[in-house]
Amino acid sequence: MIKAVVGANWGDEGKGKITDMLAKEADIIVRFQGGANAGHTIVNNYGKFALHTLPSGVFYSHTTSVIGNGVALNIPVLIKELNEIVSKGVPAPKIKISDRAQMVMPYHILFDQYEEERLGGKSFGSTNPVSLRSTQINMQKSVSR
């Protein structure tokens, strides 16, 4: 049986927690979009974790976690999260990453910081380079493969 958890409110709906509950019996969990600006907190037998890049299925050894092509993939954040969960005793997760996942590059982060500084008190709230990365996808100038 296929189950999908989809949000319609730009986040903060509890999708990560619901996905974690469903992951207990899932063979595959797919994170299909979003970036490290989004996050969800999972509390389980291993401890409390704030995930920003990893799919919720990483805590279940029988589950394959997929990072899909719509994800703004920030490699340093991914590595940090992997190291954090493994250091707390979570078995190394089975992860597959789409070869079309969009890479967050250092210039995306710098551009986001400069834009926030330029806007000053009228800033839109950092999206942690997701907005620039999304713009580049729409312009077909993103970095993948």
Predicted segments, located by residue:
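Non-transmembrane, aqueous-exposed alpha-helical and coiled segments at domain scale
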Residues: 1-145
